[in-house]
């Protein structure tokens, strides 16, 4: 009873934090009004193939993205995930965690972008000035999670977020928080998380420096005073997730996981993700799902994937996962993950 009360208190704090930080009308989506939008890209081919319905599953190293409480019961290991995004943009995600027993588990993750050079164009040189520029996006986090009881875990994932485009950059600190609760109902797990709760970002740098003439009508003043243009503050893409996962008892040869997540983001309408995974003999898995149910004008829809896992020796295991995500009129997305448990 005490554990349940603790869980309810934590969940109430999480929900209260996100709702107080997200006061907007339901008829306004606020799409495109946040910085560091790469933080909203699903990480982990397995999770993405399940329609991104993973907050209550969160049982591999990508849990640091979905629900940091998940690493409390995840074995030691690392994962590498590559996402081939639109316009030849790629995103890499590396995460790993170590279980320290009764004192909890710690983990680290790094998300980075791979974006090629682009031409610098101006009004007078629409075909390019001869210069090129690029951009980079990075998020680094250190997570901690602990299993407070056999049925309840909580996790925290502080992170540093950085974006740069040409000679301008911005950074911010943020945190993800999550809980997992194994309910009294056989095979049902409840998960909740809040992601990217933190500072706003503001672009600063050399491109904002200009030469200013305070009195252009006068010839006696200095018309080349160095000045810096002011830029605005932009919030991170705050997101609240709550979900259920159900794993029926099918014996040792077969494993089935069904999951559903509801999302309340700060820069879009609410939506629902659903997905499932079937695994045969702990070796071969097939996955499918649908993301953004009930979301207006969403291009992202169904996802499919598969994975293989091989136990090498003792606790050492290797796994590889693939995911395909349909994006409607946009280019479809593909993800590949490689993981090692030890």
At which residue positions do the language-model features occur?
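Bacterial N-terminal signal peptides
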Residues: 7-16
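Short strand-turn segments of transmembrane beta-barrel domains in outer membranes
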Residues: 52-54, 77-85, 323-325
């Amino acid at each position: 009873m005490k554990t349940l009360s603790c869980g309810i208190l934590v969940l109430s704090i999480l929900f209260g934090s996100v709702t107080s930080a997200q006061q907007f009308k339901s008829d306004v989506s606020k799409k495109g009004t946040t910085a560091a939008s790469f933080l909203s890209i699903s990480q982990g081919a397995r999770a993405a193939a399940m329609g991104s319905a993973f907050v209550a599953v969160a049982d591999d190293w990508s849990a640091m993205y979905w629900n940091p409480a998940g690493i409390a019961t995840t074995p030691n290991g690392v994962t590498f995930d590559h996402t081939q995004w639109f316009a030849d943009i790629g995103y890499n995600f590396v995460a790993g965690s170590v279980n320290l027993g009764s004192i909890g588990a710690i983990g680290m993750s790094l998300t980075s972008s791979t974006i090629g050079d682009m031409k610098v164009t101006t009004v007078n040189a629409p075909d390019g000035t001869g210069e090129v520029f690029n951009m980079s996006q990075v998020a680094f986090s250190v997570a901690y999670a602990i299993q407070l009881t056999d049925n309840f875990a909580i996790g925290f994932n502080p992170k540093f977020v950085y974006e740069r485009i040409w000679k301008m950059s911005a950074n911010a600190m943020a945190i993800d928080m999550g809980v997992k609760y194994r309910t009294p109902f056989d095979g049902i797990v409840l998960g909740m998380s809040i992601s990217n709760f933190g500072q706003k970002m503001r672009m600063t740098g050399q491109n904002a420096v200009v030469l200013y003439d305070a009195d252009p009508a006068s010839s006696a003043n200095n018309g080349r005073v160095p000045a810096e243009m002011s830029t605005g503050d932009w919030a991170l893409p705050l997101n609240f997730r709550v979900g259920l996962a159900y794993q029926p008892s099918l014996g040792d040869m077969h494993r089935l996981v069904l999951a559903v997540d509801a999302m309340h983001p700060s820069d879009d309408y609410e939506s629902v993700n659903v997905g499932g995974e079937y695994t045969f003999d702990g070796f071969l898995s097939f996955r499918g799902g649908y993301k953004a149910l009930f979301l207006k004008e969403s291009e992202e829809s169904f996802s499919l994937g598969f994975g293989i896992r091989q136990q090498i020796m003792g606790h050492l295991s290797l796994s590889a996962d693939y995911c395909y995500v349909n994006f409607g009129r946009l280019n479809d997305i593909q993800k590949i993950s490689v993981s090692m448990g030890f």
